[in-house]
Design a protein with these regions (language model features):
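Short, charged, surface-exposed secondary-structure boundary motifs
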Residues: 110-118, 135-136
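Conserved N-terminal beta1-alpha1 strand-loop-helix module at the mouth
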Residues: 1-107, 117-131
Length: 136
């Protein structure tokens, strides 16, 4: 059962055009505009990576990106995750912003804790550089 009516934990993801973007990557262009171009160019998965960034700024960017994904008619086909910031992903979902989950690193919050906060329907991505990390 979903904690959030808009969330969708998919059985499979198309990672063929996984697009990672944040304000630090766009040379002053609006992140949402860059995401719009990426979607029109065939992006299949969106990750907001805003470093550095405070919760309010990341939430605002996430709201804009989620709207762009919806405006492109891809809310059900293109997952949207936030990098590292489980707190922001939780806040977005609480506010009704369609964020599908997070991508966290080995030194971030434990994936089990992220799952507990975001629910069973959330995507929890985890960076892994070693086979042992995948098996852990």
């Amino acid at each position: 059962m979903s904690n959030y009516p808009y969330a969708s934990m998919r059985d499979r993801y198309d990672l063929s055009a996984y697009f990672v973007v944040g304000p630090q990557d766009t040379k002053g262009r609006p992140v949402a505009g860059v995401v719009d171009e990426a979607l029109k160019g065939g992006a299949t998965f969106i990750q907001l990576r805003a470093k550095p960034g405070d919760a309010a700024d990341i939430t605002a960017a996430a709201r804009q990106i989620a709207q762009v994904i919806a405006d492109n008619g891809k809310s059900e086909s293109v997952p949207f995750v936030i990098d590292d910031r489980v707190d922001v992903a939780w806040q977005c979902r609480y506010l009704g912003i369609k964020v599908d989950g997070v991508h966290i690193g080995q030194t971030d919050m434990q994936p089990q804790a992220a799952r507990a906060l975001l629910g069973d329907d959330a995507i929890i991505g985890l960076s892994a550089e070693l086979v042992a990390q995948v098996r852990a």
